Every structure is written in C-alpha cells, then in structure tokens.
Amino acid sequence: MLDTILQTKREEIERLALPEQVEVKKVSLYDALRKPNRSLGLLAEVKKASPSKGLIRADFHPVEIGKSYEAAGADAISVLTDETYFQGHRDYLTKVKQAVNIPVLRKDFIIDRAQILESVRIGADAILLIVSTIPTTRLKELYDEAHELGLECLVEVHSEEEIAELFSAFTPTLIGVNNRNLKTFETDVAQTEKMAQVIPHGTMFLSESGLYTYDDLQRVKRAGATGVLVGESLMRASSPEEGIQHLFGGEPVATDA
C-alpha cells in the first residue's frame, strides 16, 4: 500500500501548483509539546478517512473540529492533506490554522521540496517526515530545508532498523513512533514500548496510531512518550471534547498557579 501511495504522490508533485502565501502567525509545535496542557501532550488529528478504515467521519467539518480540539485542551492539531487516500485537502489545513491559536502540523507523505514550499504557503507550523518513504540522506535534506523555511518537523519511525538508520544520519528534535506498520497497516501499541528502549533518553517522542483508551495512554506514558498523536478515536467520538475527556480519563487541563 505504501508503494502505491508514494507513486501517486510522485505523480501529484509533477503537476503541483503552489498556492498564494497565507499570512498566519507561526506557533512552535516543539514548545507546545514540551509544556503540555495535561500529563501527556496531545496532537489531535483532523481526519476524515484512511486506507485501512475507510470513511471515519461522514459529518466532517474541519474548522469546527479544530476549534473544538483547541477548546478541549489539545496542545496541537494535525491535519491530513492527502486527497486520494485520506480524503483530506490542503485547504482544510489553511482554514483550521486561521481559526486556532495552537500549532498545526501538516500530515501527508512529504518526499519533495515542492511539498515543503507548499506547506509554508498554506500556513503549516510543522510537517511530518516519514523515514520509510525516502532515503535517510534525502530526509535529512528535507528536514534542513524545512527548518530554513521556518517549519518544524515530526520525524516518524516504526522499527528499530529505521531508528538506527535515522540516528546514524542525525537526531531530530521530535520523533514520532508509529504503532502502525505502513506495509501491513496493522497496529500494536507495544511498538512504542519496544522503540522506547532504543530512543536516547531525553529525546522528545510521540506515540502515534492505535491509541483508543486511557490505558493505552498510560502504557505509552510509562514507556517515556512525551505525547500522543490521536485521530481515529477522537473522530469517531460523539464530539471532539468527549473524545479527549474519554482518552485522558477525565484529566483536567492544567492551569497556571
């Protein structure tokens, strides 16, 4: 499936037309996750569909969802912009970014500099880079180019082999451990526990995918995760607020003394 997605992405890049620059205030994803509103940082995802689950939320209003996430204490928002496989759109990200004050990450299969330029123009604060999609040397180039253009990066790994390959090239500021195998699309939260053993102590990392319950969050917290990226369980909830409350076991948002 991943190979098919990447081939589609390469074809899209060939005909990519860059939009006009959107003027928005940049907000740091790194800073938001370093000082989360709850015991774990929450990167809440705006996600209509996926290849593995099909349509996740038919009643889909990205701006309303994004504003609800912010009101419920999410630290940042991830917006799917892939159209073909996730029914996302880059305009969703722009509209969400214009409506909230917390960081917004572009979640897509970013493999080319043109997509980084596009991400800047649509107003993203950060982008996702996936180790399994491109050679590590190229990923490092994209990482550096993104930072030069004012974008932060969440660098995603799944296996011990990928993380060894990544760290042999460079150490990102923020890592995402995907509990989903992108080749089989199967998920296992134990992947975060396993990967935590090989991530250097003190490195910020998120657990991604397959997180549905308070117990799931406690597992990855014990493993050392800085935060979580959650989409499906929040999108399937009766409301984003209810979904976040359920996920965090009713834990309130921290208030400054």
Curated annotation (Swiss-Prot):
EC supergroup of this enzyme: lyase
Gene Ontology BP annotations: L-tryptophan biosynthetic process
Stretches assigned to coiled coil: none
Matching PROSITE patterns: IGPS
This protein's record includes keyword Electron transport: no
Keyword Calcium attributed: no
Entry-linked InterPro entries: Aldolase_TIM (IPR013785), Indole-3-glycerol_P_synth (IPR045186), Indole-3-glycerol_P_synth_dom (IPR013798), Indole-3-GlycerolPSynthase_CS (IPR001468), RibuloseP-bd_barrel (IPR011060)
Keywords: Amino-acid biosynthesis, Aromatic amino acid biosynthesis, Decarboxylase, Lyase, Tryptophan biosynthesis
Listed EC numbers: 4.1.1.48
GO function term, MF aspect, one: phosphoribosylanthranilate isomerase activity
Catalytic activity entry: 1-(2-carboxyphenylamino)-1-deoxy-D-ribulose 5-phosphate + H(+) = (1S,2R)-1-C-(indol-3-yl)glycerol 3-phosphate + CO2 + H2O
Family: Belongs to the TrpC family.
Protein name: Indole-3-glycerol phosphate synthase
Gene: trpC
